[in-house]
């Protein structure tokens, strides 16, 4: 069949163009090392691949959150460990201070040391993270949470905000403990009230004062603090307790009063050890929680009062209350440290799980996406040879004419 010159050029150009196009299409796969780049390469595999990549991306986000939450909880746990160590020193020195052989100068020296401990815990409570934010200020990370006042009291300037991060599907972890819950919400060792002893000639002690019946606890009709007056109206040597509220309204009279035996009024249960004297008066002020700073301040005030206490018996009673609260504060700090430790255990568990899951996902992704280099290179070389052969054939045929046969 006779082939025109134009047809010859067209057919050969088309052949080389197709082979060149085939070669060019293979280049991106080789350069990227991927078998599937777009949906048109393999629509089914591309869909599966998208699922794998989304899951891997989500784990990467979880892992970023894990790093952040781990850093914060490690810092929190360390802060509580330092605080607990300091509180143990506070307890040790306060026990040493209860020695009649000590002079006022000795007690003042211990009080000065207590002030150093207060400063140390305050520094811990005002700790910052790696980005410069206060870790115990709640959501007010730019606001110093605790401020020392001239009288050694401490005020909280943060809020109660708690932040969480997602570290797994439906798994969230706290990354902070606000300062009020960390250092101020320590349960009162006596219960829900703190006693003050207006007169305590008999040397009795309030050992327990709790709201044991919330339904009967009426703070509108009978607001706290509650005054307990010890009387003997019958002059029979048997004490009664006249209970009045903050407005001096009478609530009830406990008759007879029995030392060590609990009595109740307005939903409140009270136990008093020892025998009060007629005319003694105690006041129960509502105080469910006591901050760690209040406790250390109380210890400092007790020490600085020294031998000048008007009532040495009452001074010893106050000592017992303060020591009990020091013990309660130390235990509370240990529990808060434990909460940070539990968070770290959860974080580490999720981190390990993500490592296993990510390995499985990467294997699945690789089986779909990654290129078989040996096969791809072989195919590329074959296509390259085919193109070269077509080019050489065209070049040789292009140089032929009728004169070559004469």
Where are these regions (language model features)?
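Amphipathic alpha-helical polymerization modules
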Residues: 1-151, 173, 301-406
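Cysteine-poor, low-complexity segments in flexible/peripheral regions
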Residues: 144-311
């Amino acid at each position: 069949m006779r082939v025109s010159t134009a047809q010859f050029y067209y057919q050969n150009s088309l052949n080389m163009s197709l082979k060149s196009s085939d070669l060019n299409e293979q280049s991106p796969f080789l350069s990227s090392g991927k078998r599937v780049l777009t949906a048109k390469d393999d629509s089914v595999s591309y869909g599966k691949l998208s699922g794998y990549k989304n899951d891997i991306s989500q784990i990467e986000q979880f892992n970023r959150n894990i790093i952040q939450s781990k850093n914060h909880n490690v810092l929190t746990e360390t802060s509580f460990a330092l605080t607990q160590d300091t509180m143990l020193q506070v307890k040790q020195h306060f026990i040493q201070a209860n020695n009649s052989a000590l002079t006022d100068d000795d007690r003042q020296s211990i009080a000065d040391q207590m002030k150093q401990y207060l400063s140390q815990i305050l520094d811990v409570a005002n700790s910052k993270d790696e980005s410069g934010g206060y870790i115990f200020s709640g959501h007010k990370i730019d606001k110093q949470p605790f401020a020392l006042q001239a009288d050694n009291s401490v005020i909280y300037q943060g809020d109660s905000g708690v932040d969480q991060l997602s570290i797994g599907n439906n798994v969230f972890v706290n990354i902070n403990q606000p300062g009020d819950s960390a250092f101020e919400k320590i349960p009162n060792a006596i219960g829900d009230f703190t006693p003050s002893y207006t007169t305590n000639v008999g040397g009795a002690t309030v050992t327990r004062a709790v709201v044991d019946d919330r339904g009967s606890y009426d703070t509108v009709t009978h607001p706290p603090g509650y005054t307990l007056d010890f009387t003997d109206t019958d002059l029979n040597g048997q004490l009664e307790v006249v209970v009045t509220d903050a407005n001096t309204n009478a609530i009830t009279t406990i008759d007879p009063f029995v030392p060590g035996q609990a009595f109740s009024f307005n939903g409140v249960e009270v136990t008093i050890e020892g025998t009060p004297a007629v005319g003694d008066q105690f006041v129960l002020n509502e105080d469910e929680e006591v901050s760690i700073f209040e406790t250390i301040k109380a210890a400092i005030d007790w020490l600085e009062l020294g031998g000048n206490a008007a009532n040495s018996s009452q001074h010893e009673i106050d000592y017992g209350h303060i020591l009990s609260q020091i013990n309660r504060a130390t235990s509370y700090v240990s529990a808060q440290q434990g909460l940070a430790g539990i968070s770290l255990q959860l974080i580490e568990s999720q981190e390990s799980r993500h490592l296993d899951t990510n390995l499985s996902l990467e294997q699945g992704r690789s089986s779909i996406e990654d290129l078989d280099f040996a096969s791809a290179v072989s195919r590329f070389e074959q296509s390259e040879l085919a193109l070269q052969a077509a080019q050489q054939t065209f070049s040789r045929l292009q140089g032929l004419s009728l004169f070559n046969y004469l």
